[in-house]
Amino acid sequence: MSTESMIRDVELAEEALPKKAWGPQNSSRCLCLSLFSFLLVAGATTLFCLLNFGVIGPQREEKFPNNLPIIGSMAQTLTLRSSSQNSSDKPVAHVVANHQVDEQLEWLSRGANALLANGMDLKDNQLVIPADGLYLVYSQVLFKGQGCSSYVLLTHTVSRFAVSYEDKVNLLSAIKSPCPKETPEGSELKPWYEPIYLGGVFQLEKGDRLSAEVNLPKYLDFAESGQVYFGVIAL
């Protein structure tokens, strides 16, 4: 029932009352009727406002139907947590050179800054891939010498021995020469340093073996840790 209808009913009720001479009793009745009419109109108006603004009555479901925003936020959080957990389970290896051996490049998986995790293995100086997938392969060496009594050519190579074929295939390779020409006899022999860094992404198979080698290990500089290393990271 609308507010206008309720007011109209009150007015009709007042007109239907018998018109009598105004006296003390009739004045009291009119006052009570007026007060009742006012309270009725005020209550109806308040009820209409509460219903119109949704304070009472059935709630509007269009604000968050089925709690989709909350569920979506929770799903996104769970996805991010799952993604970070999966990243920590991926195979990874970082091996360093053994500085205690002379004129050879031997990799160590134990010690400072060395790491083998989640299935990676170091066997016969080669890193063994534990599962199929994309891998970041990288390696760095640092050569050091004193003068150039002869022409020096330095190479650094990362090779793959695949399960599907036994041939050795070079994945990464670089060649450098610190001495473009020989140092004349009697001249001052100046020290030289030559770093080589290799890196790339490759599709590898389970059981593949990777090696990192140099042609002249006698020139390797093991004076500082972190100068010669070899690593693989699953993507």
UniProtKB/Swiss-Prot annotation:
<dbReference type="GO" id="GO:0045944">
    <property type="term" value="P:positive regulation of transcription by RNA polymerase II"/>
</dbReference>
<keyword id="KW-1003">Cell membrane</keyword>
<comment type="similarity">
    <text>Belongs to the tumor necrosis factor family.</text>
</comment>
<dbReference type="GO" id="GO:2001238">
    <property type="term" value="P:positive regulation of extrinsic apoptotic signaling pathway"/>
</dbReference>
<protein>
    <recommendedName>
        <fullName>Tumor necrosis factor</fullName>
    </recommendedName>
</protein>
<comment type="function">
    <text>The TNF intracellular domain (ICD) form induces IL12 production in dendritic cells.</text>
</comment>
<comment type="subunit">
    <text>Homotrimer. Interacts with SPPL2B.</text>
</comment>
<dbReference type="InterPro" id="IPR021184">
    <property type="entry name" value="TNF_CS"/>
</dbReference>
<dbReference type="GO" id="GO:0010573">
    <property type="term" value="P:vascular endothelial growth factor production"/>
</dbReference>
<dbReference type="GO" id="GO:0065008">
    <property type="term" value="P:regulation of biological quality"/>
</dbReference>
<keyword id="KW-0472">Membrane</keyword>
<feature type="lipid moiety-binding region" description="N6-myristoyl lysine">
    <location>
        <position position="20"/>
    </location>
</feature>
<dbReference type="GO" id="GO:0006955">
    <property type="term" value="P:immune response"/>
</dbReference>
<feature type="modified residue" description="Phosphoserine; by CK1">
    <location>
        <position position="2"/>
    </location>
</feature>
<feature type="glycosylation site" description="O-linked (GalNAc...) serine; in soluble form">
    <location>
        <position position="83"/>
    </location>
</feature>
<feature type="topological domain" description="Cytoplasmic">
    <location>
        <begin position="1"/>
        <end position="35"/>
    </location>
</feature>
<keyword id="KW-0735">Signal-anchor</keyword>
<dbReference type="GO" id="GO:0051092">
    <property type="term" value="P:positive regulation of NF-kappaB transcription factor activity"/>
</dbReference>
<dbReference type="GO" id="GO:0008625">
    <property type="term" value="P:extrinsic apoptotic signaling pathway via death domain receptors"/>
</dbReference>
<dbReference type="InterPro" id="IPR002959">
    <property type="entry name" value="TNF_alpha"/>
</dbReference>
<dbReference type="GO" id="GO:0005615">
    <property type="term" value="C:extracellular space"/>
</dbReference>
<feature type="lipid moiety-binding region" description="N6-myristoyl lysine">
    <location>
        <position position="19"/>
    </location>
</feature>
<feature type="transmembrane region" description="Helical; Signal-anchor for type II membrane protein">
    <location>
        <begin position="36"/>
        <end position="56"/>
    </location>
</feature>
<dbReference type="GO" id="GO:0005125">
    <property type="term" value="F:cytokine activity"/>
</dbReference>
<dbReference type="InterPro" id="IPR008983">
    <property type="entry name" value="Tumour_necrosis_fac-like_dom"/>
</dbReference>
<dbReference type="GO" id="GO:0051239">
    <property type="term" value="P:regulation of multicellular organismal process"/>
</dbReference>
<keyword id="KW-0519">Myristate</keyword>
<feature type="site" description="Cleavage; by SPPL2A or SPPL2B">
    <location>
        <begin position="39"/>
        <end position="40"/>
    </location>
</feature>
<feature type="domain" description="THD">
    <location>
        <begin position="91"/>
        <end position="235"/>
    </location>
</feature>
<keyword id="KW-0597">Phosphoprotein</keyword>
<dbReference type="GO" id="GO:0033209">
    <property type="term" value="P:tumor necrosis factor-mediated signaling pathway"/>
</dbReference>
<dbReference type="Pfam" id="PF00229">
    <property type="entry name" value="TNF"/>
</dbReference>
<dbReference type="GO" id="GO:0050793">
    <property type="term" value="P:regulation of developmental process"/>
</dbReference>
<feature type="topological domain" description="Extracellular">
    <location>
        <begin position="57"/>
        <end position="235"/>
    </location>
</feature>
<feature type="site" description="Cleavage; by ADAM17">
    <location>
        <begin position="79"/>
        <end position="80"/>
    </location>
</feature>
<dbReference type="GO" id="GO:0043123">
    <property type="term" value="P:positive regulation of canonical NF-kappaB signal transduction"/>
</dbReference>
<feature type="site" description="Cleavage; by SPPL2A or SPPL2B">
    <location>
        <begin position="49"/>
        <end position="50"/>
    </location>
</feature>
<keyword id="KW-0325">Glycoprotein</keyword>
<dbReference type="GO" id="GO:0005886">
    <property type="term" value="C:plasma membrane"/>
</dbReference>
<dbReference type="GO" id="GO:0005164">
    <property type="term" value="F:tumor necrosis factor receptor binding"/>
</dbReference>
<comment type="function">
    <text>Cytokine that binds to TNFRSF1A/TNFR1 and TNFRSF1B/TNFBR. It is mainly secreted by macrophages and can induce cell death of certain tumor cell lines. It is potent pyrogen causing fever by direct action or by stimulation of interleukin-1 secretion and is implicated in the induction of cachexia, Under certain conditions it can stimulate cell proliferation and induce cell differentiation. Induces insulin resistance in adipocytes via inhibition of insulin-induced IRS1 tyrosine phosphorylation and insulin-induced glucose uptake.</text>
</comment>
<feature type="site" description="Cleavage; by SPPL2A or SPPL2B">
    <location>
        <begin position="34"/>
        <end position="35"/>
    </location>
</feature>
